[in-house]
Amino acid sequence: MQLLNFGLLLLPFVAGDLAPQPEPLLAGPSDVVPGQYIVTLKEGLTSAQIRDHKKWVSSVHRANLDSFAAGASGVETEGIMKHFHIHDLNMYSGGFDEKTVEDLSRNPYVKSVHPDQHVYLAKTVTQRQARWGLGYMSSKGKPVPLHSTLVDYSYDDKAGEGVWAYVLDTGINVNHIEFEGRAILGHNAIPNKPHTDEFGHGTYVAGIIAGKTYGVAKKANVVSAKAFDTGSSTYNYILETYDWIVRNITDSNRKNKAVINLSISGAKYQPFDDAVEKAFKAGITTVVAAGNDGKDAKNNTPASSPNAITVGAVRWENTRPSFSNYGKLVDIWAPGELIKSCWKGGNNATSTQSGTSAASPHVAGLVAYLMSIENLPSPSAVTARVLNLTIPNLVKDAKDSPNRVAYNGIQERKFTLPKYY
């Protein structure tokens, strides 16, 4: 079975270090959650069949627990824990003994059984201030000064109004002044933890999407969907949170006015790629980070999800940072090095960070921006529009990636344009 080590994608830097060492891509044995699994059911099952399957699982699990063989494993298990339903994809998490796992693997209703996994956050440190990223988004990829605070960012003044950006991350400081009351708490999957951002990553990502100063879509709403805390998570929580997001978008009739940002990455893990793909088929757009391993993104999840918008990082002078993943599955490049945004620790706190965690929300913000000014009826239309606006052949060392950088199209629009300084 393939294992996955997820991490949030901001990189550790020291001054002058532009080639940091990435976190390990593959998980070690200690990363597996003992006795805990993610089970994916086959498609086409009826509600009655799923109910019967759950009853069967409970019965088999109880019988195995009562046997000597199950007790000898030394792992206390609790059976089915949570169920996830994304479009027509049905999955559940559970704590099972080895015998029950064997029984599940042979069950005709089961597509796959994968061990659950701890998910780790990448370390971050504060950097000098920089504002080049926004100016880059409206400059057709023209190189911009790294440390300038007078870079123009031109945009339509609808600026994401009426659109909802869902940030699956460490939470968001919804009281930060950058959000002007447009950020709300949605779902917290972490038990016995408050729905606050103690790590900073989620607030940072949300600021790039929709902050009044640092955001691409300055009037968009942002929803905090907390699947990480201060250092680790598991698929049990990530899938629960992603499931909640898809349901909330669907129930709120926001499919054409919502985008999900996933600034996370790890080794290829099919169950989560399947979840992202099913959300796409349900009419929901997901933007994901390419990953920080300096390798081909085809080996990463969710970067390898075929219909996610996968984002690599580009520097201010149109070069690929050595950390950014690349490859044919990278759809687009966006600013991802020395990007300033909101941070933890106060309602006006900021930090400057690097990584594909910063690149992805630039494009998620662009999606929100375009949704507010154009009629984009489906994820396919969203992706086509974003890619149609890109500027080609600018990124140096893009390797075999599609070479196109993000652009908001403003120079082709006939509006009175506000400017950001």
Swiss-Prot record:
Domain of life: Eukaryota
GO annotations of cellular component type: extracellular region
Residues excised as propeptide: 17-122
Gene Ontology molecular function: serine-type endopeptidase activity
Domain Inhibitor I9: start-end pairs: 36-122
List of catalytic residues: 169 (charge relay system), 201 (charge relay system), 357 (charge relay system)
Name assigned to this protein: Subtilisin-like protease 2
Species, as recorded: Trichophyton verrucosum (strain HKI 0517)
